[in-house]
Curated annotation (Swiss-Prot):
Tissue specificity annotation: Expressed only in the oocytes within the ovary and at lower level in the testis. Found in the resting oocytes of the primordial follicle cells, at the periphery of the ovary and in the hilar region. Also detected in growing oocytes, but at lower levels.
Chain intervals with Basic and acidic residues compositional bias: 121-137
GO cellular component: a single term: nucleus
GO biological process: oogenesis; positive regulation of transcription by RNA polymerase II
One GO MF term attached to the UniProt entry: protein dimerization activity
Subunit record text: Heterodimer with TCF3/isoform E12.
Phylogenetic placement of the source organism: Eukaryota, Metazoa, Chordata, Craniata, Vertebrata
Protein's recorded name: Factor in the germline alpha
């Protein structure tokens, strides 16, 4: 009795590699293809053919990309100039573009308040100005006050206040952003008479 050793289980044959594209094409039909961006001309047969040379299309893309890069550089140069002019920016970190715009807005509002104070003080008589203790050139001193110590309140501004607390308050930074708040209350009129 010759017993042959039991043969091990045969290995499974590995199926041929299948490409997903081929499977989808078999089920769905031809797949859409990515095409270069170019102008197409409709043919009498209903198909389309390109009217542009591929080199011209690529050259137009290069020109458009160069224009966009130059536009972004100009924008960044403008922000750099604005950053140099605005005094109310955080010094402990590099301010973002949003910080620069907020600081510029606050600065413009404060300068507007200084101009309003100057107009009001010009309308006052010289006696009232000396009694109020203001110097002869009030808008210059107000500007110096605001620029010298931004947290010192004036008659037009209640100072710079921290934005409301919360996870969004510091925009991912450890230093708070500051915003300008006017202390004047808007006038309300009653349209009903009793």
């Amino acid at each position: 009795m010759d017993t042959a050793p039991a043969s091990p289980e045969p290995f499974l044959v590995t199926p041929q590699a299948e490409v997903l594209e081929e499977l989808i094409q078999a089920q769905m039909g031809p797949l859409p293809r990515l095409a270069a961006i170019c102008r197409l001309k409709r043919l009498p047969s209903g198909g389309y053919s390109t009217t542009d040379d591929l080199h011209l299309v690529l050259e137009r893309r290069r020109v458009a990309n160069a224009k966009e890069r130059e536009r972004i550089k100009n924008l960044n140069r403008g922000f750099a100039k604005l950053k140099a002019l605005v005094p109310f920016l955080p010094q402990s970190r590099k301010p973002s573009k949003v910080d620069i715009l907020k600081g510029a807005t606050e600065y413009i509002q404060i300068l507007g308040c200084v101009l309003e104070e100057a107009k009001v003080s010009e309308k006052q008589s010289p006696e009232e100005q000396t009694h109020s203790g203001r110097p002869s050139d009030p808008h210059v001193s107000s500007t110096r006050e605001l620029l010298g110590n931004a947290t010192q309140p004036t008659s037009c501004a209640s100072g710079l206040k921290k934005e409301e607390e919360g996870p969004w308050a510091y925009a991912g930074h450890s230093e708070p952003l500051y915003s300008y708040h006017q202390s004047t209350v808007p006038e309300t009129r009653s349209y009903f008479t009793h």
